A protein has these predicted regions:
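Alpha/beta enzyme core
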Residues: 1-104, 108, 114-123
Length: 123
């Protein structure tokens, strides 16, 4: 009813400790089942990779490519690389690694601005 073309999923893959507490369970399976139940398969799911305002000590041994492969495996339609917190720009190397790992769309998320986009988008 909202007319949305996509949703952004913060906890699609892997656990994290966030400002709102422990996010122990990734939501990929639950979200995909709910999308199907609603008959909303046309609504794309964009997965946040390394949610902002979070500690990723639980997944510190995973590089950005591993996050991308997991999101692909769990059928994300696209991915978002964000800064570590609001107004902190995404890391250009992580953005480049994500894009080199997948053919799916990868967006620069939180922290990307018109002023810094040209710099962080450099491959």
């Amino acid at each position: 009813a909202a007319g949305a073309s996509f949703v952004r999923a913060e906890g699609f893959v892997f656990a994290a400790v966030a400002d709102e507490g422990l996010l122990a369970n990734a939501c990929a399976g639950e979200l995909l089942r709910e999308r199907k139940r609603l008959g909303a398969e046309s609504i794309k799911i964009y997965a946040d990779l390394r949610k902002k305002h979070s500690s990723h000590a639980l997944t510190a041994d995973l590089d950005m490519a591993a996050w991308v492969r997991a999101a692909e495996f769990f059928q994300a339609d696209g991915m978002i690389v964000t800064g570590t917190e609001t107004a902190v720009e995404p890391d250009s190397a992580e953005l480049a690694m994500a894009r080199a790992t997948t053919k799916l769309p990868v967006l620069a998320g939180s922290g990307a601005t018109p002023e810094n986009l040209a710099r962080i988008e450099v491959p």
